[in-house]
């Protein structure tokens, strides 16, 4: 992705707001982005992970599950006005270094994609052997290793640009760093297979 528009906007805001103002960025960015920013000395800057669910944006803003907060040094207290805002929602606060927060967003989406891929693959198998995926799902949700909130609804592959972008980011980092992203490439392949089925 071209990150220049986000960089330009952050620079514009950094110069335009008072130095004591806290800057919080929610845009999806790759690991290492926040650490590379060249902000004015003394600027309090945080990267906050946002996990949007289509059709439930307001609900998730009002009742967040948790806040994942990327910061320069997670052992230091958050800026007071920002911490006051976050604590008003009475949910867990997870401060971590910038890179961890940036990768946490991608990790969440990868786990979601894994669930979607499992559901799609096994639901199709059900159709071919006379099983009913809807009967199997409750058994999975009662298994504590999987859980009641698991996303186990089959569909037509991975939908939404954020998921696909995160998979691409993982593959690019993996290729550059020499790590194995075979399972991620398999998820992409499975999604394409499901979409081509239509």
Show where each model-derived region lies:
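Gly-rich Lys/Arg/Thr-decorated short loops/hinges at beta-loop-alpha junctions or inter-strand turns
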Residues: 1, 63, 181-182
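Rossmann-like NAD(P)-binding element
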Residues: 1-22, 32
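A general structural signal for well-ordered alpha-helical segments in protein cores
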Residues: 6, 10, 79, 104, ...
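NAD(P)-dependent Rossmann-like dehydrogenase/reductase catalytic/cofactor-binding core
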Residues: 127-198
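Short strand-turn motif at the edge of the Rossmann-like AdoMet-binding core
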Residues: 26-29
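Short secondary-structure boundary/capping elements
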Residues: 4-9, 53, 95, 162
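Internal alpha-helical scaffold of NAD(P)-dependent oxidoreductase catalytic cores
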Residues: 16, 36-48, 53-148, 173-177
